[in-house]
């Protein structure tokens, strides 16, 4: 096993811009120029072995990043390595051969690596733009649902897989004892079942906040990684290992872990229930919202302190509204009201809809107050009576 210093040295060298004859730049151009995996005849020379080079470079970066993250935790270096690995695998699948047997495997790796690099929106788009026929394993399908935050689909898929008779422990044991079973096929079934069972535990952890369920999921995936290693099942070793890092990352940045359990002063009675309802309502959305984005984390942490003053300057779509929602949650739990001032009427309407969607399930009213033609009696009433 390499030391942390050795892994850091390797990844620092492997992520230098323009390494290997600008391989990643050539790979991006190669993927954009081709159609169904075939380059046009007038394409410039991008390297006869570019596909092999991209795969080898991507796997090397991915292995090193996972190993360093396991030893020393996430860092700027591991994030950069995951991003460069994702670039390599994205180049391998974009506009690729639709009949390639490993197209689904490589796409899953690209999306997972982007997610671990902190680019969950890019990971989402890697999966959201494709058709269903990807030649993927059950474990890869489950990871796809997790990355797309379609937890209803994830729950249904793993339930169906785990309830299918041939995937039960007794049936698998009987097949092995019968002597007629293909051992590699049985091991693949065991590994996919373990991944699905782990994600069932993890889904429950995201729903309830139970640390024990997260630890059970992580333990199952650690077992799967060891079994895949011993069985020399290379694809499922990558998938189970990536899945373990994915749930680590998601849990670390989940709302359960980042919204304080200790209530603000004076909110001891209301805050625990409001916190639970807030997280549950976001989890229950069609596209579940279970974690904080990298752009939100520092501001969100400060917004939980009701004694703090805060100005948050972030680009469009970087998640400012979620920070405001967390600040509002802490304020409302202290039995105080929230006033939102926006510079545009259109933004007022959008913010009103967003806050109503979030806070109506918690029992709070959101006013419609735009002030276009002075202050009416109804406006005065809204200011006096509405919580937001």
Label the model's feature ranges.
Residues 1-388:
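N-terminal helicase ATP-binding lobe
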């Amino acid at each position: 096993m390499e030391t942390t210093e050795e892994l850091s040295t390797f990844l620092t060298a492997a992520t230098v811009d323009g390494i290997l004859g600008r391989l990643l730049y050539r790979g991006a151009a190669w993927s954009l120029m081709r159609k169904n995996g075939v380059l046009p005849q007038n394409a410039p020379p991008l390297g006869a072995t570019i596909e092999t080079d991209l795969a080898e470079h991507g796997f090397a970066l991915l292995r090193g990043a996972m190993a360093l993250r396991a030893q020393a935790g996430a860092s700027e270096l591991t994030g950069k390595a995951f991003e460069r690995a994702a670039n390599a695998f994205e180049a391998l699948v974009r506009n690729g051969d639709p009949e390639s047997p490993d197209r689904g495997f490589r796409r899953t790796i690209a999306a997972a690596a982007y997610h671990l690099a902190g680019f969950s929106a890019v990971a989402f788009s890697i999966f959201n733009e494709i058709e269903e026929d990807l030649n993927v394993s059950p474990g890869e399908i489950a990871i796809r649902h997790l990355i797309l935050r379609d937890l209803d689909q994830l729950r249904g898929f793993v339930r169906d897989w785990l309830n299918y008779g041939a995937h039960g422990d007794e049936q698998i044991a009987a097949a092995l004892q019968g002597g007629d079973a293909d051992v590699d096929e049985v091991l693949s079934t065991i590994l996919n079942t373990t991944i699905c069972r782990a994600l069932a535990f993890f889904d429950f952890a995201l729903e309830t906040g139970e640390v024990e369920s997260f630890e059970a999921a992580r333990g199952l995936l650690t077992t799967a990684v060891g079994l895949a290693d011993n069985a020399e099942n290379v694809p499922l070793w990558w998938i189970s290992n990536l899945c373990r890092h994915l749930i680590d990352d998601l849990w670390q940045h989940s709302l359960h872990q980042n919204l304080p359990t200790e209530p603000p002063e004076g909110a001891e009675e209301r805050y625990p229930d409001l916190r639970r309802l807030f997280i549950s309502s976001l989890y229950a959305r069609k596209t579940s919202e279970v974690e904080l984005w990298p752009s939100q984390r520092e501001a969100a942490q400060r917004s939980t302190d009701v004694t703090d003053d805060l100005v948050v300057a972030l680009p469009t779509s970087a998640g400012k509204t979620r920070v405001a929602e967390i600040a509002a949650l802490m304020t409302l739990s202290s039995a105080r009201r929230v006033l939102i001032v926006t510079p545009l009427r259109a933004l007022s309407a959008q913010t009103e809809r967003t806050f109503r969607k979030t806070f109506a399930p918690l029992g709070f009213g959101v006013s419609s107050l735009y002030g276009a033609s002075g202050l009416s009696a109804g406006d005065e009433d809204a200011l006096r009576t509405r919580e937001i």
